[in-house]
Amino acid sequence: MAQTHSFNGRKRVRKFFGKIPEVAEMPNLIEVQKASYDQFLMVEEPSGGRSDEGLQAVFKSVFPIQDFSGASMLEFVRYEFDAPKFDVDECRQRDLTYSAPLKVTLRLIVFDIDEDTGAKSIKDIKEQDVYMGDMPLMTDNGTFIVNGTERVIVSQMHRSPGVFFDHDKGKTHSSGKLLFAARVIPYRGSWLDIEFDSKDIVYARIDRRRKLPATTLLMALGMDGEDILSTFYKTVTYTRDGDNWRIPYSADRFKGMKIISDLIDADTGEVVLEAGKKLTARSAKQLAEKGLKAIKATEDDLFGSYLAEDVVNYATGEIYLEAGDEIDEKVLKTLIDTGETEINVLDIDHINIGGYIRNTLAVDKNESRQEALFDIYRVMRPGEPPTMDSAEAMFNSLFFDAERYDLSAVGRVKMNMRLDLDAEDTVRVLRKEDILAVVKMLVELRDGRGEIDDIDNLGNRRVRSVGELMENQYRVGLLRMERAIKERMSSIEIDTVMPQDLINAKPAAAAVREFFGSSQLSQFMDQTNPLSEITHKRRLSALGPGGLTRERAGFEVRDVHPTHYGRICPIETPEGPNIGLINSLATFARVNKYGFIESPYRKVVDGKVTNDVVYLSAMEEAKHSVAQANVELDERGGFVDEFVICRHAGEVMMAPRENVDLMDVSPKQLVSVAAALIPFLENDDANRALMGSNMQRQAVPLVRAEAPFVGTGMEAVVARDSGAAIAARRGGVVDQVDATRIVIRATEDLDPSKSGVDIYRLMKFQRSNQNTCINQRPLVRVGDPIQKGDIIADGPSTDLGDLALGRNVLVAFMPWNGYNYEDSILLSEKIVSDDVFTSIHIEEFEVAARDTKLGPEEITRDIPNVSEEALKNLDEAGIVYIGAEVHPGDILVGKITPKGESPMTPEEKLLRAIFGEKASDVRDTSMRMPPGTYGTVVEVRVFNRHGVEKDERAMAIEREEIERLAKDRDDEQAILDRNVYGRLADMIDGKVAAAGPKGFKKGSTITRELMTEYPRSQWWQFAVDDEKLQGELEALRGQYDESKKLLEARFMDKVEKVQRGDEMPPGVMKMVKVFVAVKRKIQPGDKMAGRHGNKGVVSRILPVEDMPFLEDGTHADIVLNPLGVPSRMNVGQILETHLGWACAGMGKKIGELIDVYRKTANIEPLRDTLEHIYPDNDRNEPVRSYDDDSVLMLANQVKRGVSIATPVFDGAVEADINAMLTDAGLATSGQSTLYDGRTGEPFDRQVTMGYIYMLKLHHLVDDKIHARSIGPYSLVTQQPLGGKAQFGGQRFGEMEVWALEAYGAAYTLQEMLTVKSDDVAGRTKVYEAIVRGDDTFEAGIPESFNVLVKEMRSLGLNVELDDTRDEQQQALPDAAE
């Protein structure tokens, strides 16, 4: 028999429906973050020193720093990181930032300057390590721990540096004329705009300031008028020929022109072309071939053209005419009078070549470089008088000084590509050639040649990831520091100082802290489930510093662009104001060194698709024709069809197969991770797919995770890359397992310097950022062999290494008494009782005892005026026990605060004298459970300031922690001993001893039996004659001692950290954190959703017996409204239902076969069925070669339902679903007869029924529902606050007032607006009246009315209220009169 495979049952086996083979490996999903930050920090210094990027580049750009006189200089040598003080977990617990100290080696050089010659000689060199603050480190999962919370730095999309050509789309001028503009955007520095106005004059702007003629800029670059014209225009020479003139003929110049007068050969005088004809390119070429050299021109032809050069009288130096002057009769006469026989004019025909630059030169008032520089200076620094030096220095610093202006390598590359230049990418400033090339290109565009740029093309937008954002931020900090250093170098006695004395690292550290703490791009990580983590790390935002703002971003920026294909997901983006501004990276995309997003393609060579994969950016892709991944191929890899659908330069077209040179690697390369998790995505409407991918990120991890029957094959990738499921770091054998850790004895890559033991600590019931529960469960048993990369533990929302966001539930599509009207969801009570959608949420409560002015607060069980019943859950230190069940209002931590002394009444004095009671000096400020939350205390942490005595509880927690550490150390020591002594025994077994322990005969043979007579620690005393072996023994002993020492040192260090006091905010003496776990069952009002954007709210939970049921008595779990499908066009859910039904049917069939096996011990029927389900191909498990145990294990895994994978755009089709339904023995319609649970009658029509994967979303009714009777009021308006967080009340708003007005309910309305709302005096009066038993009251003036009056007064309107009641009563005449 062929080689047998065994199945360990630790992974979910899926039947793959995909037909397209996976050619490229999907890149690690959080590579974007990790690679970027690693490249920035470069923690390990490579052997040849670090390259100039990241942190190294920042230091290199700021150092060396010279003082103002040049007498000393501070140089940067290198930097290095020390080990972080606390590891990730300790930082999380103690609210610290996970970071490593940065040490920089600086060299201070002091010069002697010769006063006469000014020559420098080195007088002194000092080198020193300087501490430069802490640098946050990234965790293995691509996040940062800042002040104890996990944060993510989102990558930013921004406009790439370089040059962009654009026009105003005809919006500026009323005629709709296109005004072209060019903009040079550097990475940092001044922007340069060059633009046309409506009169076709070219202007330049620097930093969006007042515009200057572009020729002013060119003159400032050192050109004069003649240079400028000769750069932009060719010349035509008119030569005097008797009375007429002749001009040279060139085919290029004349082609396409309409001839106004006859074209006459100047040499022969014959007419070569009559007037009124058009000279085509072909006929123009023919004339040149026939030998036409020059043609006749008249004076009329000269009029209106422009001189190409100055006309000068060389004898006197007088300039008669200047270059660019228009030729008219007067000018021509002057020319003829000076005896000129040749006139050079500019080649401007106003059709193909416009005279824009010449016209600009004519408008420009500046004549010389100095005037031009002064003009620019006045624009940039208005109000300052310019001098030549200051103007020149300012102009140079704008574009030509590397300190102030940086195009960056990207900018230079883009500029070279756009303008066909060939500058090195180390030239990061502008050159004269660049500016000229930009103006030339702009004029070409105006003349109708060339294309404008599309700024939404991904070739013109780039991604700034963590590393680069951090680099910019750190540079800002260093530049602030540089100023301080320069000042200090000048003011201090430089000979006596060390580099340490010059440097104050605070600005650099502050810049880093500010970036991680308050930057728009540093975000609190969305940790609801593993998918939301991964999506957050792969997010691209166009917002943030230097980016767009929501209000200003138009439709174009938000829209999907053809270049997004395979780079940015067209589906996943938020609904609402941020739509299209926040995107997600596609599954296979990666970011290249220039920050452009690349997508992988397979090469097509000679019509054959190869497996070579190339990554291309949007700019490079535009040159190729790219076929889609699902194009049909024959077995040799050639295209089957003559014409293939492909993409070329943003257009989709049919191309002959010979022209195709690339092909997509995978159909899912165009969508993001979340969208790739939706099966049958191809059958869903885009809007619903968007909701589906967004709602998966809100799914709450359930108590019992279950992977979907109908998956897409991406589930395992997400679980692994997100770090939720734990993968083995190297191969080995499981040594110990319990709920909190897995110990693996390594058998692969055993490095002598590393321990031979891997200990994996599992997270137990930890709180996530979103209060969901993070809990990991081991999947392995003692003795299991482990391969590198195997999943050894499941995390939150993972099931056997597959992402499991929800549960498979049996759904019937039918209306049920209006309970599923408008997307409501009807649930069965069974779902609640079986805890199908039960989740655990962990709330954190924190209480701090501070040192107040009146004395310290105290955490204690001794609280005034509180019954013993209320203290039942507290220990002697006043802190709640672990495991206590707590209800709203229960005390979690008892705390008393000293009260200020108030003057005592005589009675109080008497009582105080009698009882000597001092208890009234404190008030109860205990931490209590907030309203509406019930739960169980799962963890308590106590933090003490240094030097504050620890209470009992803190000591107990500390002891527990130290015991855990000791156990870890002992286990690792035991495995080390086993490993080392085992190797030692193998090495000396059967060898002749040259020496041994006491009582051992020298020269006898060492055997294992003999060795067991001595304690293991004495085995090292055996020695052998073989020198090589003896050397190995000694090396092993050295290694063993070293490992032992390292273990002990690590243990002592951890213990010291546990015993040491904690860093506390100022004024805090002691802090207690209590974690309460809340079990949330599903209930009416909770939001649920499928993966296809089909969301709804639970409306009612029905008793099981009332739910519709099948013939065999199976009740539906959920009833959904069929009307939710047609208008939403998310048919994917129906296909999923049918396929899920087939999966469950197959599972049931396998369950029956397992029963057969148990009775008959014949496994063949089971094996045959499984082989039929998982046919042999490269994507399925090799079930054919499984041994019997593996077959049984697999069968047990799939008996609830066979798991399948239907990848997006390459999934199961109708025929596949039909085939699977048939195999399971079910109707291919996918419908069944259902019976009403209440009456037992069958329903009239058959009902679609099947399994859908449903999620419970993080919009739970418990978090939203809220009640208040009395609570806080707003200070100003005296109205209740709003919202659950503020414990707010209801507001009788504007519309409600209208309702009462409409009813004319005047008294009710008066009550609402006064005593029931914010009439303070009235409120108290009503209370008093009720106490008296009186039911009359009088309304006063509401506080909000007073606010209105005050606001009007603040506007300067004096509003006074006159009480006119008495006067009116007097004025009324008596009725009797």
Swiss-Prot record:
It comes from the Bacteria. It catalyses: RNA(n) + a ribonucleoside 5'-triphosphate = RNA(n+1) + diphosphate. GO terms for molecular function: DNA binding; DNA-directed RNA polymerase activity; ribonucleoside binding. PROSITE patterns: RNA_POL_BETA (PS01166). Signal peptide: none annotated. InterPro entries: DNA-dir_RNA_pol_bsu_ext_1_sf, DNA-dir_RNA_pol_bsu_external_1, DNA-dir_RNA_pol_su2, DNA-dir_RNAP_su2_dom, DNA-dir_RNAP_su2_hyb_sf, RNA_pol_bsu_bac, RNA_pol_bsu_CS, RNA_pol_bsu_protrusion. It holds the Pfam family RNA_pol_Rpb2_1. Keywords: DNA-directed RNA polymerase, Nucleotidyltransferase, Transcription, Transferase. One of its GO terms (biological process) is DNA-templated transcription. Its EC number is 2.7.7.6. GO terms for cellular component: DNA-directed RNA polymerase complex. DNA-dependent RNA polymerase catalyzes the transcription of DNA into RNA using the four ribonucleoside triphosphates as substrates. NCBIfam families: PRK00405.1, rpoB. Belongs to the RNA polymerase beta chain family. PANTHER family: DNA-DIRECTED RNA POLYMERASE I SUBUNIT 2 (PTHR20856). The RNAP catalytic core consists of 2 alpha, 1 beta, 1 beta' and 1 omega subunit. When a sigma factor is associated with the core the holoenzyme is formed, which can initiate transcription. This is DNA-directed RNA polymerase subunit beta. It comes from Brucella anthropi (strain ATCC 49188 / DSM 6882 / CCUG 24695 / JCM 21032 / LMG 3331 / NBRC 15819 / NCTC 12168 / Alc 37) (Ochrobactrum anthropi).
